[in-house]
C-alpha cells in the first residue's frame, strides 16, 4: 500500500510540475538581410566604376565585412551592374570608415560624390534573403 501511495504522490507531483512549466516556442531566426544595388554607369565610365567598387571591396575586407557580390549586365534591361551586399551595423560602418581613412579614401558624403562621378543613377533596395519560395511562404504562415 505504501508503494501505491508513493507512486500516486509522485504522479501527482509530476502532473503539477508539468502543468506549471511554460514551454517556450523557439521562434525561427530572422531571415538574412541584404541590400540590392543597381548601377547605371556614365557612358565610358564602366571601368572607373568597377575600380571604385573594387576599392570598396578592399575597405570592406579591411573592416572584416563581407564584400558586395557584383553581377554584370549582358542582355536585357539598361543597368550595367547589380550588387548584393550585407546590411551593415553602425559598428561595421564605423570600421569601414576607419579603414577607408587609413587607405586615404574619402568617407561620408564625399565618398558618395566620388561614386556619382561614375554613375548616371543607382538604386538601393533593402531585402530579406536569399530564401526559397517555400521559406517565404512559411514566413507568411502558409
Where are the regions a protein language model picked out?
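Short beta-strand-to-loop capping motifs
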Residues: 38-43, 85-89
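Short structured motifs
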Residues: 34-36, 53, 67-69
Amino acid at each position: 500500500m505504501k508503494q501505491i501511495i508513493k507512486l500516486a504522490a509522485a504522479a501527482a507531483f509530476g502532473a503539477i510540475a508539468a502543468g506549471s512549466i511554460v514551454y517556450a516556442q523557439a521562434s525561427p531566426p530572422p531571415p538574412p538581410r541584404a541590400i540590392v544595388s543597381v548601377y547605371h554607369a556614365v557612358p565610358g565610365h564602366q571601368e572607373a566604376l568597377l575600380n571604385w567598387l573594387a576599392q570598396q571591396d578592399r575597405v570592406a575586407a579591411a573592416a572584416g565585412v563581407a564584400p558586395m557580390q557584383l553581377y554584370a549586365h549582358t542582355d536585357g534591361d539598361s543597368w550595367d551592374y547589380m550588387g548584393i551586399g550585407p546590411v551593415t551595423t553602425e559598428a561595421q560602418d564605423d570600421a569601414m570608415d576607419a579603414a577607408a581613412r587609413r587607405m586615404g579614401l574619402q568617407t561620408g558624403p564625399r565618398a558618395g560624390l566620388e561614386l556619382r562621378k561614375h554613375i548616371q543613377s543607382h538604386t538601393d533596395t533593402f531585402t530579406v534573403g536569399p530564401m526559397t519560395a517555400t521559406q517565404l511562404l512559411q514566413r507568411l504562415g502558409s
